[in-house]
């Protein structure tokens, strides 16, 4: 293996817990929510659909088009998630937009504990790295804030390249940017969409779920690279 591709959400970082997310969004709207009410509302908002959260329980017909295109266009990503949040009656004016903006800011995310050590280790080993993400906004500033931007050689974001995982084209684009053959590339992710890299010719490693901010086994990527190099 000569290069590694990493998924972003659920692999390198995770969104903050739903109650913290809601409290922060409400505060932006000038509302200080009582924690018990926040817990109830947060559960309803996550069920409706949160960027970085589980799939929504249902997609209202009026949001079907923007939902289908959420990872291809910035405007669709915003419209989909603010629209889903607006289906929950929270009684707080402006909350859907505030919650969406929270997800777009680095404060709304927690890098996994082994993110920096793994990226530094791969850089020391001379292994180029790309981040390949289905997403509707720019995550590069997150890596700058976390002090690891210089350890990533390329970002391949679905809304910028017009392709989403598991389409092999997005993985091939990443390999091309790194100048490596797919057959000599490892894709590291946490969902079946990431495993779509197999169709592009890449080896694939899927990591288990881990709590935000904890170690989630990223170091296994470096171990696999080392093992293939003998």
Predicted regions: what is each one?
Residues 1-6, 30-31, 91-94, 116, ...:
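Asp-based, Mg2+/Mn2+-dependent phosphohydrolase catalytic module
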Residues 1-116, 121, 125:
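N-terminal helical cap/lid subdomain that shapes the substrate entry/recognition surface
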